[in-house]
Amino acid sequence: MKIAKKCKVIVASAIVAALMAGTALPALAASPAGDVPFAVLAQQNDVNADKVQAIKDKLANIDVSYEDGIWLFESAYEDYEISNNKSYMMPYVYSNGETVRFGMSFTSQDTEGYFYWNDVDVLIGEYNNYTSQTNYKFKKVSRQYYPDDQIFLEEVSFGGNDEDMDCLSRILNADTAYLRFNGAKVNGTQRTQTTIIDSESRQGMTDIINLYNLLQSATVEERVAAFGT
């Protein structure tokens, strides 16, 4: 489903543009690295072949796409969640080569209709006895109906920060965690969906966090070499 990817590209492009405003990108990072032979990159001081290979290894379980000057890295487990009509949260990573950032997305799917949610709770622990709660509020949630699948999809993506990374860490360190999509009242009816954060989502979160940390420690040249070869 293209809506989720498009939302991420829009968010990533806007944030990277803001970060780079007034700053010219190095020529090496301005275009897909496939145009730059690795032999040329290897001659530069800031390329470590082992680091490049380590990034490539991490990308084995990641869906990689390039659009509008942005590399987007998404967990391959999102395909599982979408195909099985699940609701989930997932981090993602985006980069223009020089800058590396991570984002967050929340997605709900239902066959009966929209929930019309604009806030989501992350509940750590058992549902009826959770130990912590993080609430996310949103001004705009994208909604689209897919008639072939008879799915009402709602999705939001945004740039992540340290608090979001802390939330992900608490999820991964907990035995159980849930998402609660709090629907708005429409025509006197309010629908709320609660779903467990499953093992596939947890693995996807782990893969993205590991990739993000590795890219943060790499040089521009190492990232570009890994992305394009």
Feature map (PLM): residue ranges:
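A generic "folded-domain core" signal
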Residues: 29-229
